[in-house]
């Protein structure tokens, strides 16, 4: 093994920024998440709304990718994507998904499990037109998850559409939209010294959230 690679793989550190106690937790995991999200924002962590979305295909092969959190309330979170994408095809066959927020700078991570469902088109349309015009055009320029021969094909298509819609409203793409994830489980992880981390899991039983400490 290369010496530099070996050094990288053997490198570790102590997690000593904070701790997490049960009496600090909110009754609802999404309310707790909002607190941590605000603290992540104050810490100036880049891309705090980036979350790793996990899905499974029809052969039980798991996939992960980054998507952006765009809405949250006490029951659900929402993200947007192309309905012809790989992730959308997975969700069509299996609505069970996972969401992971890795906030390493704070020695924290949050894991959500839940079920994905398309949101109403009126809500999708409303959000679509809050995006920048270039972002609206990019939806039309990219056939997401499809193989392309070279980058210039994508760039040329974007520039062509940008010119076409220079003085026009970009049409709403019916093949694009949002998913709400109804949360069924949530785990909060806070790194601690000696790898004795704090972990708490929320499980919904009979419409009520129950909180349990997990061994690290």
From Swiss-Prot:
Positions that bind substrate: 70, 127, 131, 135, 195-197
Positions annotated to bind FMN: 65-70, 80-81, 86-87, 109, 144-145, 189, 199
GO molecular function terms listed in the Swiss-Prot or TrEMBL record: FMN binding; pyridoxamine phosphate oxidase activity
Cofactor requirements of the protein: FMN
Cofactor binding note from Swiss-Prot or TrEMBL: Binds 1 FMN per subunit.
Keywords, comma-separated and alphabetical: Flavoprotein, FMN, Oxidoreductase, Pyridoxine biosynthesis
Pfam families hit by this protein: PNP_phzG_C (PF10590), PNPOx_N (PF01243)
Catalysed reactions, semicolon-separated: pyridoxamine 5'-phosphate + O2 + H2O = pyridoxal 5'-phosphate + H2O2 + NH4(+); pyridoxine 5'-phosphate + O2 = pyridoxal 5'-phosphate + H2O2
Protein's pathway: Cofactor metabolism; pyridoxal 5'-phosphate salvage; pyridoxal 5'-phosphate from pyridoxamine 5'-phosphate: step 1/1; Cofactor metabolism; pyridoxal 5'-phosphate salvage; pyridoxal 5'-phosphate from pyridoxine 5'-phosphate: step 1/1
SUPFAM superfamilies named in the record: FMN-binding split barrel (SSF50475)
EC id: 1.4.3.5
Subunit (UniProt): Homodimer.
NCBIfam families the record matches: pdxH (TIGR00558), PRK05679.1 (NF004231)
Family: Belongs to the pyridoxamine 5'-phosphate oxidase family.
Protein name as catalogued: Pyridoxine/pyridoxamine 5'-phosphate oxidase
UniProt source species: Wigglesworthia glossinidia brevipalpis
């Amino acid at each position: 093994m290369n010496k530099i690679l070996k050094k990288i793989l053997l490198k570790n550190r102590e997690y000593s920024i904070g701790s997490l106690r049960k009496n600090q937790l909110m009754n609802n995991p999404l309310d707790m998440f909002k607190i941590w999200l605000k603290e992540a924002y104050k810490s100036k962590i880049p891309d705090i709304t980036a979350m790793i979305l996990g899905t499974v295909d029809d052969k039980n092969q798991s996939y992960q990718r980054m998507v952006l959190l765009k809405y949250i309330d006490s029951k659900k979170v929402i993200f947007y994507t192309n309905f012809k994408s790989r992730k959308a095809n997975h969700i069509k066959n299996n609505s069970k998904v996972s969401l992971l927020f890795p906030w390493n700078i704070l020695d924290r991570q949050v894991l959500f499990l839940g079920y994905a469902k398309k949101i109403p088109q009126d809500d999708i349309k409303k959000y679509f037109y809050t995006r920048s015009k270039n972002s609206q055009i990019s939806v039309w320029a990219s056939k997401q998850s499809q193989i392309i021969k070279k980058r210039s094909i994508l760039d040329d298509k974007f520039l062509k559409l940008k010119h076409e819609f220079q003085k026009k409203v970009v049409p709403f793409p019916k093949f694009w939209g949002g998913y709400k994830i109804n949360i069924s489980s949530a785990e909060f992880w806070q790194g601690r010294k000696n790898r004795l981390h704090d972990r708490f899991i929320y499980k919904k039983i009979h419409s009520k959230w129950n909180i349990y400490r997990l061994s690290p």
